[in-house]
């Protein structure tokens, strides 16, 4: 399904990283991101400066500023690398949409919690609008992914608003996870379950409790 809603508004920021074209530049760029990932294991995003990164990576400050005009560009580059490396999230094969949604959210939560640096950038205070916009776009992508999974096997009620509502559903889940992370420094089992309950309750308001399975073409041919 395509998303009929208008594109997300872009904030005014002039802080995109400068992506290197040459091999040695790409290697240095990756070294800096690896060093940032290491710093985030024991520091908060607000405690890391470009000079800290220069020292940790053993790279001259001029090279750091060449790639990253400021801190926002730095964190945006690491978040983009994380998003680019995420494996696909599936929804399983349960005969009911609630279990498939739970499976999808379980997989997603485990992926996002596999890295301390990702949790700090995703669930903690966003280090700038560039990262925030990447997260908004990713929630939109994930919402469409879950929608496509369910729409493939279930007869959803007709609505042009499904992309928007699934984006809201993913925002609900991440909001609960973020609250847990802010309070405990991790996402505990209680809030994992609460996120699933909240998303299912939200979607159930539009779906109802049961969705009929979609009849595939080969199955329809057998019925003729």
List the model feature ranges, each with a label:
Residues 1-13, 144, 148-152, 166-167, ...:
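C-terminal peripheral helix-coil segments that are non-catalytic and often amphipathic
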Residues 91-94, 121-130:
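Short linear capping/connector segments at secondary-structure termini
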Residues 25-36, 53, 78-86:
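Generic hydrophobic, amphipathic alpha-helix propensity
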Residues 40, 75-82, 138, 142:
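Alpha-helical DNA-contacting segments of helix-turn-helix folds
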Residues 77, 90-114:
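Hydrophobic alpha-helical connector segments
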Residues 10-23, 30-31:
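N-terminal, Lys/Arg-enriched amphipathic/low-complexity engagement segments
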Residues 35, 39-73, 77:
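Helix-turn-helix
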Residues 102-106, 110-113, 129-155, 163-167, ...:
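Amphipathic alpha-helical packing segments from all-alpha helical-bundle domains
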């Amino acid at each position: 399904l395509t998303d009929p809603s208008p594109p997300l508004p872009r904030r005014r920021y002039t802080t995109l990283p400068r992506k290197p074209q040459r091999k040695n530049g790409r290697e240095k760029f990756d070294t800096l991101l690896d060093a940032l990932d290491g710093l985030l294991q024991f520091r908060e995003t607000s405690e890391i400066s470009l000079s800290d990164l220069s020292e940790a990576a053993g790279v001259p400050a001029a090279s750091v500023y060449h790639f990253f005009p400021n801190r926002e560009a730095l964190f945006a580059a690491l978040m983009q690398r994380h998003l680019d490396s995420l494996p696909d999230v599936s929804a399983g094969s349960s005969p009911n949409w609630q279990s498939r949604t739970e499976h999808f959210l379980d997989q997603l939560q485990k992926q996002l919690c596999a890295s301390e640096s990702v949790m700090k950038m995703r669930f903690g205070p966003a280090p700038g609008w560039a990262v925030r916009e990447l997260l908004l776009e990713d929630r939109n992508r994930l919402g469409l992914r879950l929608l496509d999974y369910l729409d493939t096997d279930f007869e959803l009620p007709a609505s042009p608003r499904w992309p928007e509502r699934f984006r809201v559903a993913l925002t609900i889940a991440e909001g609960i996870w973020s609250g847990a992370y802010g309070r405990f420094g991790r996402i505990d089992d209680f809030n994992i379950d609460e996120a699933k309950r909240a998303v299912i309750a939200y979607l159930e308001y539009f779906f109802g409790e049961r969705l009929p399975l979609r009849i595939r073409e080969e199955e329809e041919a057998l019925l003729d």
